[in-house]
Amino acid sequence: MDDSFDIYEIKARQVLDSRGNPTVEAEVLTAGGGYGHTIVPSGASTGTFEAVELRDATEKYGGKSVLNAVSNVNDIIAQELIGEDARNQRLIDQIMINLDGTENKGNLGANAILAVSLAVAKAAADTASLPLYKYIGGCNAYVMPAPMMNVLNGGQHAGNALDFQEFMIMPVGADSFAEAVRMCAETYQSLKKVVAEKYGKDAVNIGDEGGFAPPVKTIDEALALLLEGVKRAGYEDEIVFTLDSAASEFYDEKSGSYIVAGEKVSTDKLIDIYKEMVAQYPIVSIEDPLFEEDFEGFTKATKELKGIQIVGDDLFVTNTKRLKKGIEMGASNSLLLKVNQIGTLSESIDAANMAFRNGYSLVVSHRSGESEDSTIADLAVALNSGQIKTGAPARGERTAKYNQLIRIEEELQISKYAGKDFKVPF
């Protein structure tokens, strides 16, 4: 019997994320010397139905310290998992879910549970002398995702007047992931010059995800700026646009309307605005175009915005129960996968598989509060997701993921860059 995969030690600590807020880091060591560690991310605009991120609510770090979550790993989770075979990912995740005993992981904290879940997978992969993407995805993990790079920031990610949260570029015309990164990096620098020319050098400050946050006042102004940056870089034929509206952030529940550019807008009117944008600009994907509880509205938007990828983030929160409802109603046609929304690796994979089985595309995503941890890069390849969004080609916590994907592509030798096949990459 091979006991080298048995979990020997689990340890957690409080560290900082890219916004200067505390988060949980977990380390797992196996009897065979395999080592895995993970730093969990945190979102700024969060879905109401996400798994609970446990915070201490004390004076330290303005109430955001995570020492209780750290203690839950060191004093509760570790005691239950030491001696378990790290390869039994689903069993390990279920043990933690049962230990927590709540629907939303609010007892132990999704940040505690996820840190251990991912660190266990990494330790098992290291024990097996396999890269994480190959350990999770097997020999069929070969698709390099098309990156959605957030180069213009608004909403909760910036301090400007933009209602929409993310304006992204996706280099579908590249021949490889490395070339895709180059196209985006060159466009990013081109856009920087455009922003400086139009708004002054002081306007090239950046938001949480590395994108520029100039004093743009309207969505059309932002899209025109983006188009000019792409044209100057010379990639008008290779790069398309994707958006994250994060519409729940500018939805007024009292009136049942959206506040766009200071005016109240109905669901139908907002869908019409999207239609106009899609007709004028090379937009191929819109994330969270409507309020997170408006399944009917999502269904209508999916039908009326023909050919456009409608991505459910706050709508689904990587939860198979909500995803199942969306599938039955035809609400959106794509799942945004954020591991910390659901709290375990196995549940994240379940959501991805449900999406694929029902003809939905998949976008693996970071959060606005990130770290140098690059786990989602491996996960995107393991799942053959075809798409990843992890910020601008700037700031170390964003480039860590892109650099890891460059390494993976090099290591695979024979791989497929999703490119124009980003919706159905295999």
From Swiss-Prot:
Q: Where in the cell is it found?
A: Cytoplasm; Secreted; Cell surface
The record describes the protein's role as: Catalyzes the reversible conversion of 2-phosphoglycerate (2-PG) into phosphoenolpyruvate (PEP). It is essential for the degradation of carbohydrates via glycolysis.
Functional pathway: Carbohydrate degradation; glycolysis; pyruvate from D-glyceraldehyde 3-phosphate: step 4/5
Q: Which HAMAP family match?
A: Enolase
Family of the protein in this entry: Belongs to the enolase family.
- What residues does Mg(2+) bind to? D244, E287, D313
Name of the encoding gene? eno
Q: What is this protein called?
A: Enolase
This entry's comment on the bound cofactor is:
Binds a second Mg(2+) ion via substrate during catalysis.
**Entry keyword annotation includes Cell membrane:** no
Binding positions ((2R)-2-phosphoglycerate): Q165, K338, R367, S368, K389
Q: Which GO terms describe its molecular function?
A: magnesium ion binding; phosphopyruvate hydratase activity
The taxonomy runs: Archaea, Methanobacteriati, Methanobacteriota, Methanomada group, Methanococci
Note the Pfam families from the entry: Enolase_C, Enolase_N
> In its keyword annotation, does this UniProt entry include RNA-binding?
no
Active site location: E209, K338
- SMART domains, from UniProt? Enolase_C, Enolase_N
InterPro entries (alphabetical) = Enolase, Enolase-like_C_sf, Enolase-like_N, Enolase_C, Enolase_CS, Enolase_N
Write the Enzyme Commission number(s) for this entry.
4.2.1.11
Q: Which SUPFAM superfamilies match?
A: Enolase C-terminal domain-like, Enolase N-terminal domain-like
